[in-house]
Amino acid sequence: MLTVISPAKTLDYDTPPVTERFTLPQYLDESQALIQQLRELSPAQISELMHLSDKLAGLNAARFGSWTPDFTPVNAKQALLAFKGDVYTGLDAENLSDDDFSYAQDHLRMLSGLYGLLRPLDLMQPYRLEMGTKLANARGKDLYAFWGTRISEWLNQALADQGDDVLLNLASNEYFSAVKRSALKARVINVDFKDQKNGQYKIISFYAKKARGMMSRFVIQQRISTPDQLKQFDAQGYYYSAEQSKPDHLVFLRDHPSE
């Protein structure tokens, strides 16, 4: 089973990585093509395109300018440790064991607007480029057109390498839309996390994002390999709802949200 998650806007390049192991992103030719195009934009154009403040637009213009295809532990950091935010708070990669990192490297992928698809130990230089960005390019009107069926094909290869055909989708709709289902040779398992509020179970974004990270961690640490085993997930009060679930759409409920 292969798990996919979204990246994060928040990055941490200050905290030293907990492992010295690293690999290089596999699709840097694609990333470089995007960088070359992004370098042609002024900070004001970046601000308008990405709906960023002037300060953030300037920061990302500088990032695009200093980006280099030569990745080292000095100018880059392992993706799973560089991303921060709700999903990655739940995943808590800093406290994974070396064996956990090895398992994650084969069974976890991060979708990315700039890098397409990242493995946990792939070095990543800092960037901001959300998958939903309407960056017109030679392949079409946006990043979905740019990546086309490539991400699906890479996921197919990763699944083939482990002799499996189950893809666990713990990514947001924005990012999983970059996976072309028609080109994907996999059974997709979707998951919802619902918290009780005012007597009803609802998807609450903050909690759901963190839960996606917690389930990713659960899969890694417990070496989960089948959809049925996912039903054992019970972190921080969540429990499987057979009543609300379907074979390829699992629902987990929580009665009393906790931070």
Swiss-Prot record:
Do you know which Pfam families this protein is assigned to? H2O2_YaaD
Specify the species: Pseudomonas putida (strain ATCC 700007 / DSM 6899 / JCM 31910 / BCRC 17059 / LMG 24140 / F1)
Q: Which family does it belong to?
A: Belongs to the UPF0246 family.
Q: Which HAMAP family does its entry note?
A: UPF0246 (MF_00652)
Q: Name one GO cellular component term.
A: cytosol
Q: What is this protein called?
A: UPF0246 protein Pput_4436
Q: What GO biological process term is on the record, naming one?
A: response to hydroperoxide
